[in-house]
């Protein structure tokens, strides 16, 4: 416990006592307040008190918002107008949502990390250059992060695709980059496909991205997004290997 100083907020107290302003949400969630009067008693939680997200009244739900391409106007299911995207991000900020990385969310599902009550995850599939043009400035302004799932055959494939240099720069800026297969094909086992055929195909679709991540980003990709969200037990077995 401590006593607030003039001008103290959850973020300033988190900086002082937890070494990270980004942990201000822990103080805010625990105390129910974001600002404090001078001399007010404030409890500083030193560690997570509920990493499971399960409470007497129910359990925590963390929305994952999946985006693909952004542009001047919306078109179809995968191209969203940049103005609409910015509107959605500002809505999240204004309504107290806190964006967490997908890696943090995975740790939460394993009971290893507590998340803010209004946590949300942002992902971008495929690796469109429009992320840098439209999403990046808005996310940086609002202090949000995001996870980009890129497939190898598209990286650096033209002026509409992110390059490895783009991905390296985004990684240093705090954005999470993960694999989305090599070709963006369906990774489920095809009818009539033999064990050997499927193993070879998965070595290409799953193994090559790991090699390319190590070569270009200096690390593997511990998280993989299935193209089209399609999966089966055969795919899970290969991923476990």
Task: List the predicted regions and their residue ranges.
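A short beta-strand micro-motif
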Residues: 2-4, 65-66
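Solvent-exposed coil/turn segments that connect beta secondary-structure elements
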Residues: 7, 18, 30-32, 47-49, ...
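Metal-dependent polysaccharide deacetylase catalytic core of the NodB/CE4 family, i.e.
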Residues: 60-75, 95-98, 108-111, 116-120, ...
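Short, electropositive alpha-helical surface patch
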Residues: 231-241
């Amino acid at each position: 416990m401590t006593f607030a100083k003039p001008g103290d907020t959850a973020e300033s107290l988190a900086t002082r006592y937890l070494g990270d302003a980004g942990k201000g949400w822990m103080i805010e969630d625990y105390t129910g307040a974001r600002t404090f009067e001078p001399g007010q008693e404030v409890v500083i939680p030193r560690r997570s008190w509920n990493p499971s997200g399960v409470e007497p009244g129910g359990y925590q739900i963390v929305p994952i918002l999946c985006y693909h391409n952004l542009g001047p106007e919306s078109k179809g299911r995968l191209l969203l107008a940049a103005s609409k995207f910015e509107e959605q991000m500002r809505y999240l900020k204004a309504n107290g949502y806190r964006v967490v990385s997908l890696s943090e969310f995975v740790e939460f599902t394993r009971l290893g990390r507590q998340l803010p009550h209004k946590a949300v995850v942002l992902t971008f599939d495929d690796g469109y250059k429009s992320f840098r043009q439209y999403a990046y400035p808005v996310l940086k302004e609002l202090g949000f992060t995001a996870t980009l799932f890129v497939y190898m055959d598209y990286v650096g494939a033209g002026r509409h695709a992110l390059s490895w240099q783009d991905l390296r720069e985004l990684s240093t800026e705090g954005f999470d980059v993960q694999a989305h297969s090599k070709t963006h094909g369906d990774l489920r086992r095809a009818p009539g496909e033999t064990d050997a055929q499927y193993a070879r195909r998965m070595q290409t679709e799953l193994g090559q991205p790991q090699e390319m991540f190590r070569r270009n980003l200096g690390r593997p990709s511990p998280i993989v997004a299935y193209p089209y969200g399609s999966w089966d037990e055969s795919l899970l077995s290969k991923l476990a290997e």
